[in-house]
Design a protein with these regions (language model features):
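Beta-propeller blade termini and top-face loops
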Residues: 26-28
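Beta-rich accessory regions
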Residues: 21, 31-45, 49-53, 59-229
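Hydrophobic core segments of beta-strands in well-ordered, beta-rich domains
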Residues: 1-6, 10-18, 67-76
Length: 229
């Protein structure tokens, strides 16, 4: 349901919603004479069930420059009557030269910024949590650049209470996914990396429903730093 079909780069993208797994897309080629769409790649915006806390029902439009702007409906982590819910921030989809869909925040989100905090270059020792005391709040925009080097995994806990009763975990696993050549012949001898979002400890409220971890593939080029935004 909620189908949208738009050109993206030199190809086409078909966005839709599954009532079991949430928002998804097909990337492919469109024959205007035959009026046929030939998909070559399937991707997801949601990697588990859309309930609770998943994204669904996309609304999309062209940005007029070869990209696509999409906004999703989203269920909260609480039971709510009827069709009540929230919407995500807009996302801009673009197609890179390797036929990979790039996703980035879009719109005037800069107007939401208030108290800027900057953290200088910091060494991250293995198997130790580094707590940044001066970063607080329940609504944060994070722009972080991390040199993964040989680390197989890095974890960032956000929205963390002082005693760690509540926290949301973001984990990045370098080169721990499947071979990239399976989905793109141009990317030989490389593997997908993986990023997970875990909200099992995000709230201690009794009426908040926990969600299974999201686990999504991410392409990180050799020697490229990880940029989280």
């Amino acid at each position: 349901s909620c189908p949208y079909f738009w050109p993206i780069g030199n190809r086409y993208i078909f966005l839709f919603f599954s009532h079991t797994t949430g928002s998804q897309y097909l990337l492919g080629d469109y024959n205007k004479e035959e009026h046929c769409f030939y998909p070559t790649f399937h991707g997801r915006f949601n990697f588990m069930s859309f309930l609770p806390g998943g994204v669904h029902a996309p609304s999309a439009t062209s940005d007029g420059e070869g990209g696509v702007i999409v906004i999703h409906n989203m269920h909260t982590g609480k039971k709510s009557p009827g069709w009540r819910g929230i919407t995500t921030l807009p996302r801009k989809l673009t197609l890179d030269k390797c036929d990979t869909i790039n996703i980035q925040p879009y719109g005037d989100y800069k107007s939401l910024r208030t108290h800027h905090q900057h953290i200088d270059k910091t060494h991250l020792p293995a198997n130790k949590e580094i707590i940044i005391d001066n970063i607080q709040g329940n609504a944060l925009e994070i722009k972080a650049e991390i040199n993964i080097k040989s680390s197989p995994m890095i974890e960032m806990n956000v929205l963390r209470s002082p005693d760690k009763e509540e926290f949301t975990s973001i984990k990045f696993f370098k080169d721990r996914g499947v071979d990239l050549v399976r989905t793109n012949p141009a990317l030989k001898n490389q593997r997908w990396s993986l990023i997970s979002l875990e909200t099992a400890h995000s709230s201690i409220l009794p009426d908040v429903i926990s969600r299974a971890p999201e686990l999504a593939p991410v392409y990180l080029k050799p020697n490229e730093t990880l940029k989280l935004h």
